Amino acid sequence: MSAPPRLSARLSVLDQKKSNAPSPTSPTGLKTSLGMPPNSGSSGGGGGLKSSVGISSLPTIPSTKSTSPTLPKRNSANLSLLQQQQQQHTNKSTSPSSNTPTATSTTSPFSYLGKQASAQNLNTMMSMMMLNKNPLSPVVPQPGASLFYATPTEADDEEFEHIRNLLNSEYSVTTVQSTGALKSSNLVVMSWKNNATSELTEQDDQLENDKRDLQFIKEQLEKNNSMSKQMIYILDRFNEGLSQLEMDVAPINASMNEWSSIFNNINSTMEQVKSVLDKFDVDKIDSKINDGAKGDYVSYMLALEHVGNAIDYIAEKSHFKSSDKVMDALKQLKATGLNELETSFKSLLLKISNLVDPTTIAKLPNSKRYLAIILPNHVEEISKYIELFEKLHYNAFLKEYKDKRSKFILLSLRKMAPEKFIKQTSETKNLAYVKGSHPLISYVQETLRLYQIEYDLASELFGNQYQLILDEIIDPAHELLLETTEPIIKVRKTPGDKIFSIFPLLDLFDTFTKLLPDFITAISSRDGKHISELKTQIKHLQDTCASLLDFSLDEEKEISSSNRKEIISDATVDEISSNMINYFKRLIEYKHSVELLLKGQDNNNSNSNSNAPSSTSSNSKSSSSSSSSSSSNSASSTILPTSFIGFLEKILKNLIKYLQGRAKKDFPTQPATDFFKPPIKSVIFQINNYHYISTSLKQSKILSNQQFENNELASANHILHEFETCLDNEIKVLNSFWKTIADILITNKSNKEKDEVKSIIKKHTNFLKTFNDLNKLKFDIPDQELKLKLKTEAKNIIGRSYDQFKELCRLEKIHLEKNFVPFETTDDINRKLDRVFDSQ
């Protein structure tokens, strides 16, 4: 079977020139070898095949090469058409235009096609030209005669030469497809390269070459197999030799192990003998220890450590003969060395235990807080001393260490003069106390810092054994703290300063409560003694503060009654009112602590009530009924609310009751105003106090929204509303007083015939006399805004009635002049009112 012809395809150089494309693979139009322009097909459609003479839709010949595209077959119905086209092409090849370059390239393929067409059923037909054209498209028309008979130019000759080189080159195809018609918009130059005979020859040559290669590979594999067998044999012999050698060396190895064990035993024995001899050789270190350290404490400590190890070893090996003499010498050296080291240790302790003012200590670091006052190299030296003392079983240094460090803390704290705190506390007026200014607060904080320094130092030097040492070191300083705190808690203030004496104690209570966790960490929770003492002091502070919260305003009144007698006529703001406002202005700063105290007091009351025995006898019932009033009064004074807002509400309500009670008792009716009840002074007194309290509550932070939660704001607003209501009621009472005075001028018009002129004149005289008497009373109203408001309302009431009275006199033609004194105007009455409100 003959092989199909091989194809060679290249783009036309002439078409490349016409399209001005930069590369030979540009998708521009191409010409065939006859110079025919390509037919452009639809984009994406498969182009038909066309030979160099214009044959369209030629059947394809299956190719044996992988690079050759497979063209579609055509049925036998196209045989006549193909024969006609072949005949036409033969006729044209004999025409005068056969000088074209494509004539020679198309003759041989078609002759070959004619010979093989009937035998191979037209399946060996190959397309000579490929166009991007739909197979159903009409055949491209033949080129004109002018193209065939035109005289070739030099460029045409170059193009023909290039095409000939392409035709003579090795087979290749520009566009490659696996199946189907070639899809391209360009024409392809194609030619027959070789015949079937040459291709069969090439296949036979290739087959012979493959056979030779297979034979060579087979020979190489046989050689490798032979070499592998030889290598296996050599390795087996080598393994046998190694096994025999191992058997021969085994006895020698066993003998060497025995000799090695003997050598190790001898060497170990020699080392032990040498070590024992070193223990007994006292002369080596005798001179070093007896001569002293001379500043070289490192080598001196090593020598003394060697002495200690020798003593321990000889003490354990009591079977040594004549060891007593050596033991005595070693003990003597140990005592000498310890004396030397102890002296050095004491001097080093003095260096790190110099007294300091605690207030000058810088801020402590987060770890190793002792570095704030002790140099690191001193700590390292002391650590080495302590480590050697422990190895030598020498514990006498601990007493020296505890004494020095204990005195350091105690004397440093005494520099703050805690003994003066009691005097300072008793002399200081609590009314002027500033939060955080109590000297005991600073003292407690500095005590804690020294505890923390000592805690870190003891932990660094003694490890897990620090606790017992630390307890003894801080014990004197802790006793001083308790001795300083107790009298301050129990100090009794002057009677008038009782209310405000709670603020320094609340400040101390805050301080101790906040610092207690730090004290527990510094002292250690295992130290139950010192921690329990601190908790006891906090409990005393809590009880004292809670007792100071339970006060009665009536008691305060009795305490200052002697002073109040002198100012019995004073209707300005009461001292108790001013004190209560100032009290709560400062107490709000301790809101959290106050609530803790109130809740603690409530728990104590509930516990005491639950523990109290219940009496069932008739005698107890009778005694309780006889003293019911006194017990209820005492219970009401001791039971405190559990919240700050409840405590505030209770005290301010008691303040209202106190002011109302004092208004009734301390301001009797004055002769000038005996016509009016209640006494006008008591009304002015309540107006001044209610206005002062309500204004202060608004302006201060006592009832601020930031101080209370949402559920407490309603109670706070209710308190303020209650004082404002009391103020409005008293102002109404005062206005009714002015209306009573104005009613003096009222004349009954229905009985005007009976009223004589003297009666009207008498009303006017009584009215003026009342004003003159009021000038002696002097309404003291310190607040200028309140005074102006009350004065304006009084002028409106009096002025309106006086104007009506004057109008009545004018209409009745009543003349009130006396001794030619003119009738008083409304401005004159207003000036008299101004004098009434002016304070002395």
Swiss-Prot record:
Keywords for this protein: Cell membrane, Coiled coil, Cytoplasm, Exocytosis, Membrane, Protein transport, Transport
Entry GO MF terms: phosphatidylinositol-4,5-bisphosphate binding
Biased composition (Polar residues): 19-31
Annotated Low complexity bias: 50-73, 83-111, 603-637
Gene3D superfamilies per UniProt: Exocyst complex component Exo70
InterPro entries in UniProt: Cullin_repeat-like_dom_sf, Exo70, Exo70_C
Assigned protein family: Belongs to the EXO70 family.
Protein's name in the database: Exocyst complex component 7
Annotated source species: Dictyostelium discoideum
Gene: exoc7
